């Protein structure tokens, strides 16, 4: 049996190649009603553009029906229909290939090249938590999620700034944001000397306030970059301060001195330079103008400033019924935490917030609610927060609480099987190679595999894409994809779990189907846990 991981991308690529030269034609089906009869479709209109009268030659139909290749899913049939060319896979064979190698489908499809480095800069973390606005909190969560996605993809990531405020460190721990703490401050002596050289003729001998070195003209540099670069045309001059130079010194230090254990390809190289590194500044739209100044100042004062600097701009955060600026990030966390505690008290009775066993669970649920709210919208778009209690309900299908609830349901299922096995009701789990995957024929089972497990490696890879070659200053990322994926996976699992009884009666003739269903849900659990790890969320065993 072939052992290479099957892939949606590989299958689509082979299907399109089989039709000959031209653009992509095939699409993957996702809706339940379509998946009842087909898995891929070449729409009739697309075929008309490729072939006379939309008729696919017989030899191509034969080639599609016999399609093979690395990572290509085995084909059962391919036939013309009114909608176009419909193709269905050998589902039992696909189930077997995928569920016999579950761990392989919880890793990115295409790891990054060895030695790729990204420096993520989140200026909001230089403030104290009580001054952290909701729009700044969004940048912190986006940067943390992006760092996790890049590292899972094999990219070497360095995070700046190192946090100095102990209260900020505590708050980040509450949010389950993995960010480094500061050990010592980088020296800005060299930068200060360069700045004074540039400023000598600009200050006209005037006395300056403490901490201010003078003004530096940036207009010429903006014009050199050109309008297409994306810099604000109103950028004229920059007030150079000791604090600003300290920020640049830390960035420069981080860029030039990477930890030796940060990536195997960089081992032993303490001064790796700036050439192969991408710097991404993750800032709110309110901070963009100031960050552009810092970017240009870095280029002005340092000969070997990074050539590849990109700005990831996060849109504003609006709170329904109230100005978002009135609520700080810690207040937002406390608000959600209080809601979670109240909801659990109503469900279970008593004041569980005082129970140490529930303290961690409430913290995870609060953070899950916040992260799914903040990260389910594309970071470049404006975000609207609804503070109603429905946002933390396990009944609502869009919330982080709903995802964590289904994570706990999976844990309960496998714990129930384990307990029943220890009691002698069920046998031990047999080798996967002995399972009969033809027993998986419920449409909900194929939906879970085809829409969630099989495409998950490609999703992980797309989450970590940084298009550093695109022209202009700004960069876009798809950090919303993981949250949306986990919500849809939870909805599909919940629908299946509510309808299908997994742990049946302890009768030998029912064990085969039970075990193959458990193996499918093992894969669902693996994918779900991996997705939650990309958000810094641990799986819960109960809620």
UniProtKB/Swiss-Prot annotation:
Q: Which UniProt keywords apply?
A: Disease variant, Epilepsy
Entry-linked Pfam families: DALR_1
A GO molecular-function descriptor:
arginine-tRNA ligase activity
Record's subunit section: Part of a complex containing tRNA(Arg), METTL2A or METTL2B. Interacts with tRNA(Arg)(CCU) and tRNA(Arg)(UCU). Interacts with METTL2A and METTL2B.
Stated role: Involved in tRNA methylation. Facilitates the recognition and targeting of tRNA(Arg)(CCU) and tRNA(Arg)(UCU) substrates for N(3)-methylcytidine modification by METTL2A and METTL2B.
Give the top-rank taxon of the lineage listed in the UniProt record for this protein: Eukaryota
This chain belongs to the protein called: DALR anticodon-binding domain-containing protein 3
- Name the gene behind this protein: DALRD3
Entry's Gene Ontology BP terms: arginyl-tRNA aminoacylation; tRNA C3-cytosine methylation
| Species for this entry | Homo sapiens (Human)
Looking at the record, which disorder is this protein connected with? Developmental and epileptic encephalopathy 86: A form of epileptic encephalopathy, a heterogeneous group of severe early-onset epilepsies characterized by refractory seizures, neurodevelopmental impairment, and poor prognosis. Development is normal prior to seizure onset, after which cognitive and motor delays become apparent. DEE86 inheritance is autosomal recessive.
Organism lineage string = Eukaryota, Metazoa, Chordata, Craniata, Vertebrata
